């Protein structure tokens, strides 16, 4: 995960100080890209321990089209708690946009199912895109999407994906996002009969919060360890049939967890 540490180091050394919505302050650079070849291992950060359970359950929750934190809470995942209302609702966030984008004529568009079908039927299409950024509904969302749009690409029997992340919390958020989209590629590849290719991460406002600098320095002092592998139950052929038990992370070694506050 040298790519990730290089981004963190870039922002730590050359980031511009900016105010932000949370009042915490950030050091930021604009525009950065990282590439991860999934044949080289599963890109889960090793310079601190990452909570894979939260990553997997959050992705399954997105794919269900769910926008209430009840499922997450039932599975011991608290990463969305701070933004939910008293009923656990988050408004029309990721899952709603991915699975039920509202059209002007009253239809609801299942972007994920459409992309699965297009990958199978027309893999050379340049329209293999899913967007979570719906300007008409941004004000109804408790937190507008940070990872806003992603595109799949098929070449030589391999499925790749590029994400555009408008807002990238490098210390806390980005390791989750990298692992989540890498896992989505593995799942999509399996159900479409392709091999996993690359995950390309493109960031807009890439930032370290001002109260994460000591944690970033500690992480930068650590040497990356070999990447693990992720095994999926090969019998699952329907993207929406995956369960938590269908994933096994093999060979994950990491440095200890580093605690840091979440900016709300």
UniProtKB/Swiss-Prot annotation:
Chain sites annotated for binding (6R)-5,10-methylene-5,6,7,8-tetrahydrofolate: 51, 169, 263
Catalytically driven reaction(s): dUMP + (6R)-5,10-methylene-5,6,7,8-tetrahydrofolate = 7,8-dihydrofolate + dTMP
Enzyme's top EC category: transferase
E.C. code: 2.1.1.45
Domain of life per record: Bacteria
InterPro entries registered for this protein in UniProt: Thymidate_synth/dCMP_Mease, Thymidate_synth/dCMP_Mease_dom, Thymidate_synth/dCMP_Mease_sf, Thymidylate_synthase, Thymidylate_synthase_AS
GO molecular function terms listed in the Swiss-Prot or TrEMBL record: thymidylate synthase activity
Active site: 146
Cell compartment(s), UniProt: Cytoplasm
Pathway: Pyrimidine metabolism; dTTP biosynthesis
SUPFAM superfamilies (alphabetical): Thymidylate synthase/dCMP hydroxymethylase
Pfam families: Thymidylat_synt
The keyword Transferase is annotated on this UniProt entry: yes
Function of the molecule: Catalyzes the reductive methylation of 2'-deoxyuridine-5'-monophosphate (dUMP) to 2'-deoxythymidine-5'-monophosphate (dTMP) while utilizing 5,10-methylenetetrahydrofolate (mTHF) as the methyl donor and reductant in the reaction, yielding dihydrofolate (DHF) as a by-product. This enzymatic reaction provides an intracellular de novo source of dTMP, an essential precursor for DNA biosynthesis.
Family that this chain belongs to: Belongs to the thymidylate synthase family. Bacterial-type ThyA subfamily.
Assembly mode: Homodimer.
HAMAP family xref list: Thymidy_synth_bact (MF_00008)
Protein known as: Thymidylate synthase
Organism for this UniProt entry: Azotobacter vinelandii (strain DJ / ATCC BAA-1303)
